[in-house]
């Protein structure tokens, strides 16, 4: 579960290393975001020469959360870290590579480009 002020690792090659959630999209009173949800975030740490700079405001989709999520078949999925992938305005990933596994929930939310780039879908 990601909320305002949550810090996430960036799981792509845009140049950002860490982002901070400033808004959860999807309704005026929405407080938490899980795997497959879109957030507005600011870049807190970035490498020199990357596509994004520290202080940039970006949209990102969450691909891994520490808080477990119940699946319809009764199983649970959780990861060791909170991570997100930075998006363009049309919903495609801004980077060209994805690092680490991503949740299967992204397929249901129609993030097929991220699914195809990811090395593993859990």
From Swiss-Prot:
Name a GO molecular-function annotation. Answer: structural constituent of ribosome
A GO BP term here is: translation
Which cysteines pair up through disulfides? They are none
Keywords, A to Z? Answer: Ribonucleoprotein, Ribosomal protein, RNA-binding, rRNA-binding
**Cellular component terms per the entry's GO annotation:** cytosolic large ribosomal subunit
Asked whether the keyword Amino-acid biosynthesis is assigned, the reply is no
From what superkingdom does this record's organism come? Bacteria
Q: Cite the InterPro entries for this sequence.
A: Ribosomal_uL14, Ribosomal_uL14_bac-type, Ribosomal_uL14_CS, Ribosomal_uL14_sf
Pfam families on file: Ribosomal_L14
> Keyword Phosphoprotein: yes or no?
no
Q: Which residues form a coiled coil?
A: none
Known role:
Binds to 23S rRNA. Forms part of two intersubunit bridges in the 70S ribosome.
Subunit arrangement?
Part of the 50S ribosomal subunit. Forms a cluster with proteins L3 and L19. In the 70S ribosome, L14 and L19 interact and together make contacts with the 16S rRNA in bridges B5 and B8.
Q: Give the record's family classification.
A: Belongs to the universal ribosomal protein uL14 family.
Q: This chain belongs to which protein, by name? A: Large ribosomal subunit protein uL14
Q: State the species of origin.
A: Streptomyces avermitilis (strain ATCC 31267 / DSM 46492 / JCM 5070 / NBRC 14893 / NCIMB 12804 / NRRL 8165 / MA-4680)
